[in-house]
Amino acid sequence: MNYIQTKCLFLYKFQALKTILSNEQLQLTIQRLSHQLIENHFPFTDTVFIGLQPRGVFLADRIVAAIQAIYPEKKLEYGVLDITFYRDDVHKELHVANQTTIKFNIENKNVVLIDDVLYTGRTIRAGMDALLDFGRAAKVELCVLIDRRF
């Protein structure tokens, strides 16, 4: 394979990334998700928010910050959950574990799991398995930025 064939193969395999949401659309979506959580869970007495490592944490940080900006007097319980060793593909390749930080009790609480994308549900299943190590929640809800469907 010469240089031209190699270059074409490289360009074929690695296409330019497509922008799904602009910065403005992303901010609007985060505000919309935050307001939906306020509508469903206010005054947050029995609700906790948990961002799934690694990419769900970025979304969770923004959602929790947006809610705190609207209700600065409310103390939201927010944690971060690493699901690395709960995944069904953990033995297939090397995975680096991230930190789990849950400094509150989830027993009989409404848990909102926050992640970036829902596709097959494997990440969410792993998150729910990992969550069981912290107690039995009354209810678990999912908040995602993008639902890829099928």
Question: Which functions belong to the PLM regions below?
Answer:
Residues 1-150:
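PRPP-associated nucleotide enzymes
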